[in-house]
C-alpha cells in the first residue's frame, strides 16, 4: 500500500471540497471517492499485489482506515500524538487551511487570492504545515535528528528500499519517492504534492550529506517540483522521474509531427515512383 504496488490501479488524485461542503466519512470516500479528474473511480484490486507499480490514492485511504482500526483513534489524533507532538510541530495539523491563524492563504495562477479548499483524505491530501515544522519532520529522518524521530533509524532506512519500479527505474519506497541514486547506493528521497488551487509542494532529502530542500508554493502548479528537479540534478547528477516525464512529454508533439512528415514524404515518393514506372 505504501509503495503503490498493492494491485490497485485507480490512479486516484483527490478532488477538493468547497469551504461550506460537508466532508464524507472515510468509508464513504472509499466507496465513492471524489477524483480531481472529475471522473468516477473505483478502488479495487485489479493486479496481483507486488507485481506492478500504479499510483493509487485509494491505497492511502485504506492505510488511513488501518491506522484508525488498529490504534482505536481517529487518524488525525494518532498522528498528532505520535508524530507532531514529539517533533514539536506546533503549526501542523489537518484542519481546514483557512482556519489557521497567519495562514499564507491560497492563490490562483493569476496571483489572485482564493478561498481555500477542503480535502477528504487526511493521509493523502489534507495536511497543513509551515516550512519550519516541515523542516523538523525532514530533520528527524537524518542521522543528525534521529534522537527526535518517532521512527528508528532502521525504519527510516527501510523507507528508502525500492519497492516500485517504472520503465526499469526504482521510483518508490515505503511512502517515499526515490528521486535519484546517490553515490553510495542510497537514494535522494521525499515527496511532492499538488492540488487545487495551484498548490505545489516538495520536501526532498539527500541522506548522504543531509542536505534538504523544502518548498511550499501557492499560485503556481509546478514551481516546487520544477525547482526540486533542478536540486536533485545538482545533488546527484541524475534527472528525477518528474524531469524525465517532462522530457518525454516534450518529445511527444515533435515526435508526432516528425512521424507525420515521414509518412507524408513516403506517400509522395511512393506516388512519384509509381508514375516513373
Regions found by a protein language model. Name each.
Residues 125, 163-164, 176, 180-231:
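Extracytoplasmic/lumenal ectodomains and periplasmic regions of secretory and membrane proteins
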Residues 1-189, 196:
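Short, surface-exposed loop or secondary-structure junction motifs
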Residues 97, 206, 274-276:
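Small/flexible residues
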Residues 20-23, 208-210, 232-237:
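Short, low-complexity, polar/charged sequence segments that are solvent-exposed and flexible
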Residues 168-172, 181-188, 216-277:
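Short, gly/Ser/Thr-rich active-site loops of penicillin-recognizing serine hydrolases
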Residues 72, 208, 213-214, 264-266:
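Generic low-polarity alpha-helical segments
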Amino acid at each position: 500500500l505504501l509503495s503503490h504496488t498493492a494491485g490497485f490501479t485507480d490512479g486516484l488524485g483527490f478532488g477538493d471540497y468547497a469551504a461550506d461542503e460537508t466532508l464524507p466519512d472515510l468509508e464513504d470516500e472509499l466507496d465513492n471517492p471524489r477524483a480531481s479528474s472529475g471522473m468516477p473511480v473505483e478502488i479495487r484490486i485489479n493486479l496481483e499485489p507486488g507485481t506492478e507499480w500504479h499510483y493509487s490514492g485509494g491505497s492511502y485511504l485504506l492505510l488511513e482506515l488501518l491506522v484508525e482500526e488498529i490504534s482505536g483513534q481517529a487518524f488525525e489524533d494518532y498522528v498528532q500524538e505520535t508524530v507532531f507532538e514529539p517533533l514539536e510541530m506546533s503549526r501542523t495539523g489537518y484542519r481546514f487551511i483557512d482556519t489557521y491563524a497567519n495562514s499564507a492563504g491560497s492563490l490562483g495562477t493569476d496571483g489572485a487570492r482564493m478561498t481555500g479548499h477542503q480535502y477528504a483524505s487526511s493521509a493523502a491530501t489534507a495536511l497543513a504545515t509551515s516550512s519550519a515544522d516541515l523542516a523538523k519532520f525532514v530533520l528527524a529522518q537524518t542521522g543528525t535528528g534521529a534522537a527526535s524521530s518517532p521512527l528508528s533509524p532502521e525504519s527510516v532506512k527501510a523507507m528508502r528500499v525500492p519497492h516500485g519500479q517504472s520503465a526499469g527505474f526504482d521510483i518508490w519506497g515505503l511512502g517515499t519517492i526515490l528521486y535519484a541514486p546517490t553515490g553510495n547506493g542510497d537514494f535522494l528521497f521525499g515527496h511532492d504534492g499538488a492540488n487545487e488551487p495551484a498548490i505545489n509542494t516538495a520536501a526532498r532529502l539527500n541522506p548522504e550529506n543531509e542536505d534538504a530542500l523544502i518548498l511550499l508554493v501557492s499560485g503556481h502548479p509546478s514551481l516546487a517540483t520544477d525547482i526540486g528537479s533542478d536540486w536533485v540534478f545538482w545533488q546527484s547528477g541524475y534527472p528525477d522521474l518528474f524531469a524525465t516525464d517532462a522530457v518525454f512529454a516534450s518529445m511527444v508533439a515533435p515526435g508526432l509531427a516528425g512521424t507525420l512528415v515521414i509518412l507524408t514524404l513516403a506517400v509522395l515518393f511512393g506516388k512519384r515512383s509509381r508514375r516513373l514506372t
